[in-house]
């Protein structure tokens, strides 16, 4: 969320996005917490005869993968020298995705919105300077990383059984039942 805010305001710097920044420290703390949760999930799996002991282990593995992508996103943000016009739209989608990071979420809507943004960027005029080209390339790479972030969640959701969805998610919060389950 902090990265999206900095990008929107055009005030992202090495201090706000790079190593040692508050966002970086929060991501490191999150990663440490997820590692602890994953260890507990493995312990739970290994000590229970429950019908779905893998759920928590798979969930925290997915979140750790997403955490690695957050690290990469922060590094990319630190490479921006100037903020192209497209930075505003990238900040908006980052903020939008941040609002929807929750356990019971199927990311189809976020992937669709990201796809529309990528199409819009393809239609924008070509950069006129090398610096603009490089900064737009960084933004594009950020969007590719964001797509991977969402695809990790999508894969997790697709691998859930109906029983796991019912047990851990209760009544599914899905926009389209058919898109959720094959």
Identify the function of each model-found stretch.
Residues 26-37, 66:
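Alpha-helical segments in soluble extracytoplasmic regions
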């Amino acid at each position: 969320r902090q990265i999206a805010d900095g990008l929107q305001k055009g005030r992202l710097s090495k201090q706000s996005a790079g190593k040692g920044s508050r966002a970086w420290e929060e991501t490191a703390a999150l990663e440490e917490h997820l590692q602890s949760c994953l260890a507990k999930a493995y312990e739970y799996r290994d000590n229970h005869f429950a019908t779905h002991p893998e759920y928590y282990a798979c969930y925290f593995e997915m979140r750790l993968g997403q955490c690695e992508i957050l690290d990469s996103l922060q590094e990319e943000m630190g490479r921006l020298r100037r903020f192209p016009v497209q930075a505003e739209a990238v900040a908006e989608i980052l903020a939008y995705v941040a609002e929807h990071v929750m356990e019971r979420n199927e990311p189809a809507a976020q992937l669709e919105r990201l796809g529309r943004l990528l199409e819009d960027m393809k239609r924008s005029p070509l950069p006129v300077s090398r610096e603009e080209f490089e900064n737009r390339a960084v933004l594009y790479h950020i969007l590719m990383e964001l797509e991977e972030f969402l695809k990790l969640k999508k894969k997790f959701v697709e691998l859930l059984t109906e029983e796991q969805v019912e047990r851990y998610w209760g009544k599914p919060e899905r926009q389209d039942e058919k898109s959720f389950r094959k």
